[in-house]
Each structure stands twice: as structure tokens, then as C-alpha cells.
Amino acid sequence: MTRDLRLVPVAVGTWAVALACVLWPVLTGFAAIGSWCAAGAALACAFVTRRGALTAVACAAAAIAASSVWFALPARDAAADALDGRVTAVVVTVTTKVEPTIGGVRFSGSAQIDGATARVSVRLTGGEAPDGLDLGARVSVTGGGEPTDPGESAAVIVFARSAEVVRRPPHVFGLASALRHGFVDEVIRGLPDPGGGLLPGLSVGETSAVSDELDAQMKASSLSHLTAVSGSNCSLVVGLAYGACALCGLGRRTRIVVATAVLAGFVVLVTPEASVIRAAAMSAIGMFALLLGRRGAGIAVLALAVTVLVIADPWISTSFGFLLSASATGALLLLAEPLARGLGRWMPRALALGIAVPLSAQLVCGPIIVLFAPEVALYGVVANMIAGPGAPLATVLGLVACLAQPVPPLALGAAALAWLPSAWIAQTAETFAALPAARLGWSQGWLGFTLLTLVGAACVIVACRLRPRWLRRVATTALAVLVGTGTGMVTLSGVAGPLTAPRDWSIALCDVGQGDAILLRSAGHTAIVDTGPDVRALETCLSRLGVDDIDVAFLTHFDADHVTGVPALAGRAHTIIHGPASEPGELAD
């Protein structure tokens, strides 16, 4: 099968230029002018030689992305200067999900500052969010501002202790907010956890009911993409809408219009996360191609969607969520079929395809994940094979329950049915997270990225029997050594390790590198003082000592070598007591 990869260099080049411009703003002018000059030269050559038109398109796309950053910088700088270190009132139009934090909420939006529109991130502390604070609302916040680092989507962070909703979400935003909150507060109330807590995320993107313990289990089993609505849900909803219109005998144009409208409503309902935006752009481009009577190749549609989104918002190029979403989609489009053919030599076709889909995503996304979380979910492929089929059922039935709220019996019945696959996914996560060495430690940073990329390449070479033969032999040998070494390490750390730990300890000092993590145990109760800077090291220490339940955690102060390991306490610590924050951002984050 041939694939049209011509637009891939365009997307990669545009992404690279946008990323460089937002991380190093001083380069923006040079990048914009240079890209425009290159585009002009390539276009002139194309007219003369009838070749190189794609090069001109790639240079023009990069030039537009760089120019977009260039034109946005003055407003961002003005907003940062106006709010830096000052306590002032800012009216913000909410453009993202409102997420809970310790002692408050956080959200982002656009604001008029000194006559210019800039993106602002708000950390609201000191109480619950005011009623009506949701996507599309306009809220007045009072607090101190702090400029962000280059590459951050927002130009400035406002640390606020008070907020007033001056306009509730209007029109379709208000309807979506009412449906979303009604679903969480009324429809699924009473459904047993953890399935009941996971269902809102699978259906409408509302993750507030997901416990820390379940969140940690989903990450450990490589199922975190099922915690909330992902890009695949967009494709599912659009496909169902288009198919329903076809069954009703509607024409192609009507089907496309209805499917596109349903897509827009779904994005508003679940709030525009990075993976949802990517999938929505791909679906919209696919609908447009269908309207023109053309079939869009999957990888070409992905490349075009990435290019358009990066041009529209160059700061999305720094989003790990967007990178993971695009990478996973590309892996499914490029690797799943060859892997399925290769695995099909040893197993039935259906089983080979079932393994190839999560394996391809894991091979591509794994190296990216170790850049910020140096660990590998050892059972991720198997967990996804088992839990994956439940996600579409939970999504569709959950959406039916959400939209059927005016008819309570129907809504409650659909929610009860949706709970079954949701509970199945949660139970799968719990089971695999509890297995020995569920998260295998890996090298951090670019070294870990390179090593895991080589491992993934070796897997593809062996499974797909790529030539030449000597390359397959090298890859096979490398994988055999890796599997043997990994098995030995898992045996030593997962089985022999806990046997060497003392059982009657009262005070234990975890080896977390620079910093402290001190465990205290008395009368059946356990406490920890500080967490150190290394999440993985603390998790290893807690697992080795058999500490699954911590009554109280004390954080003496907010230096990185004392609190960076806090995520290791997720699902373990019941209470956290901390010292005073020297800066407002420490407590807000």
C-alpha cells in the first residue's frame, strides 16, 4: 500500500520553525524574513523548472508560522509588562477547561490588557470557584501577575484570591456547561467507584471525579489516554453522526454539514484539549475533502491538520499533549498495518492487529514520555488490548446519558450501561498497576529517548522482517539482550528486593539523591517528611518498604529537592501539611 507522505515534511518544518520561534523569540524576525525569502526563491525556481512547488509550500507555511509569532509578541510583551508584580483586576474570557488544584482552580483565557489581546493563565486560590466559571464565561479576577517563561502558551500568570463571574457561558457554551455539570452531579451520582469516577472523563472530558489513586493506576498501566476524552472519540462521534444521516437517506452535503456541526458541539461539550483539537481538525479536513468529492489519505490529512493548527496557534508546538496525540496518530497510520502483517506470520490476523495497534502507539510515544517521566509501562500493550474495546462503548453510552438528561429514566439507564465498560477499564488499570515492575525505570532525558527509540526501531525491524538480513540479526540480538537483562532486573527489584527490606523499621531514609524523604512509622501509622526531587526513586523506596498507605505527609518548604517527588504520594497520602509558601505560584501549582 502506498502512502502520500509529501505533506509530512511541510508539517515537520512548520512545527520546527514555530517551536524555535516561541522558545527563542529573538529568532522570530530572522526566521520569518528568511522563510519568506526561501519561499520566494523556491517559487521562482518552481516556475522555471516546473519542480520544487512543495518546497515553496513548506517554506511559506514556516514563514506564516514565524510571522504569526512575530505579530503576537508585542501584545504578549505589553501584557507581561503591565501585570508584572502588580495587583490589578483583569477581565478574562475562559477558553480552556477549569481544572481543580490544591486549594483552588486554574484556567486560561484571553484578556484585554493595555488595549491588546493576550492569553492569560489564572491560578485562583483561597476557596471554591464561583458559580458559572466555565468555558466561555467572562470573569473578573484580582491578583498579582508574573510573566511566563518563553514557550508558555500564556503571556502572563495571574495569581488571584478572588474572582467574580461577570458573564456566564453564553449560548452553546452555557448549554454544554449545563449538560456537563448535570451529568456529573446528577446522572452518574451513586454509581460505584472507580468506574463511576472514570465515566465522566470518558464521556464528556470531566476528570474531577477521578481519584489520585485511579489516576496513578491509569498511568502505571499506560491507560492514561482513557482518563479523559481523546482524539479517537472525535472520529467516533463524527462517524456515528455521518452514518446516522446516511441511514436517514440524507444527501452527502447534508451529511457533511450535520457531521461537522455535531463535531463542533462535541468539542465544546468536552472542552478543547490538545488531542481533541488535533482530531477535530483532521475530521474537519476529511469532511471538506469529502465535500469536494476527494478521499483524503490519513497521513496527508494528519500532516495538513498539524500544519494548520501550528500556524493558527504556534504555541501549541510546545504542548506535549499535542505532540503525543499527533505521534500516536501517525504511528497508527504508518506502523500498525506493517506490524500486523509481520505479527500475522505467527498468530491469527485479528490477534496480530489487536497487538499492532497499541504496540505501534507505544513504540512511538514511549520515547517522548521518558523525556518527562523516566519509566516504561511494562504491561501497557496488553492492558490496552484488554481495556481498549470498552472505551467506545463507555463514550457512546455516556454521551447518550448526558444528552438524555431531559428524560431521566433514559439517562439513568444509559449511564448504568456505560458504567460497565468504564468499570472494566478501571479494573484493568488496577490489576496491571499492581503487578510487579508495572513501571520499569528508564534513563532520563535525551539519553533515555534515544535508547527507547532504538529499542522501538529494533522491534519494528524484527517484526516486519526488514532488510538487509544483517540488520535483522543485530536487532534480534539487541532485543534478546534487553529482554534477558530486563528480566533479571525485574526479578531482582520486584521479587528479591522486597525480601531484603527490614520489616520492623521505625525510621527509614529513602535514597532520593539531593534532598530528603524521611519515613516515620509508629503504632501502625506512617508519616513522611518531604519527598525529594526524584519521583521514581521515592516510588521505588516506598514499594520496597511496602508502604502503600501514608497517614500524613509533611512538606517543610517548597524547594525542588524537597517537594518535586510529591506525585509519588498520589493514591498513598491521605493528608498533606506544608509550610508557608514564599511565592504565590508555589502553592497554586
Named regions from a protein language model:
Residues 331-437:
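Alpha-helical transmembrane segments of multi-pass integral membrane proteins
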Residues 2-8, 12-19, 151-279, 287, ...:
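Aromatic-rich juxtamembrane segments at the membrane interface
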Residues 69-87, 494-499:
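Short boundary/loop segments of OB/S1/cold-shock single-stranded nucleic-acid-binding domains
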Residues 1-78, 278:
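N-terminal leader/targeting segments
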Residues 93-181:
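OB-fold single-stranded nucleic acid-binding module
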Residues 2, 89, 115, 125-142, ...:
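Non-globular, low-confidence helical/coil segments that flank catalytic cores
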Residues 211-381, 444-499, 580:
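Hydrophobic alpha-helical transmembrane segments in multi-pass membrane proteins
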